[in-house]
Each structure stands twice: as C-alpha cells, then as structure tokens.
Amino acid sequence: MSELHSFIFEGLPVRGQIVRLTDSWQEVLSRRDGSQTGPWPLPVRNLLGEMAAASLLMQSSIKFNGALELQIQGDGPIKLAVAEAQPDLSFRATAKVMAGIDDHAHLADLVNGNGQGRCAITLDPQDRQPGQQPYQGIVPLAAADGTRLQRLSDMIQHYMRQSEQLDTVLVLSLIHI
C-alpha cells in the first residue's frame, strides 16, 4: 500500500505532501530479487525508492490525469533509471545497471560520471488524442555553475527551478525494513 498525505500552513505560502511506500515498494523489490539478474545493489535500490516516492509526490501535486515518468539517463554505471507514477498511487520503477556499483555511491557517481547525465520528466495524459505528444521537460544533472548534483532531491529541485520556474524544497528519506 502507498499512502499520500497533503498539508498546508495557514497564512503561509507553504504546502506539502508526505508519501509513504510500504507493501507496494516491497513488491517491486521482491519481483527484482526473484528475477534472473537478482537484487539491485543498495545504492540502486535507494535511488529507485527515492525516484518512486518523488514521482508520486510530483504526480499528485498537479491537476493531471495520466502518468508522470521521472527518468534519469547518464554515463555512469546506471545508464537509465525510471519511475512512473499513476494518479491512483500505483507505480513502477526499474534501472539498467551496466557496471559494478560502490556501496557508498551518490547520484553523480551512479549516473553522471562524466557530466553527461540528464533528467527528464514526462507527463503522458490518459486521454491523449491521436497525434498529441506527451509533455517532456529535460535538464542536465548539474547545477547552473556546472557542479554535479549529488542527491535526487537536489536534482528535482534544480529541475523545478529550471523547467517550471518554481521554488521547491524536497526532502527524501529512506527507512529500510
């Protein structure tokens, strides 16, 4: 089960959401654990868990009936990581891992080794008309000064400032059970 709770602070220009992934995330992990390729390394599991939570938060914060896909492509050991969220809080997440991964690797190490990483957020309407293309915004995995971003939350905040011109604070936390 996934849970989503929204809140506001009266008299302040602040609103927020909390998402909690439990059984649904465990199902994603158990499917991968039982696959021929075996479990993801811990940094990949962590990244995908954060991506799943972030995609659900973003999908639920906009008035949109369709899928929101958060995709990271890069030149590190993870070539591609994708999380897709639906309005009913269902989601899926996967990654294409091409090389060994250090247990302490950060986002920059995983997907942005040589500074070529990109983040794409795609909105795919459920009632898309023939010929209509999904909306997609793409930003580099680097700050304005070229510094490689180390955390997914930094990357999404950067995306929201660059692509949506929206000041955003995102806190992602994992609790391993």
Language model features by range: what are they?
Residues 1-173:
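General detector of N-terminal leader/presequence modules that precede the first folded domain
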Residues 175-177:
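Conserved small/polar residues in nucleotide/adenosyl-binding loops
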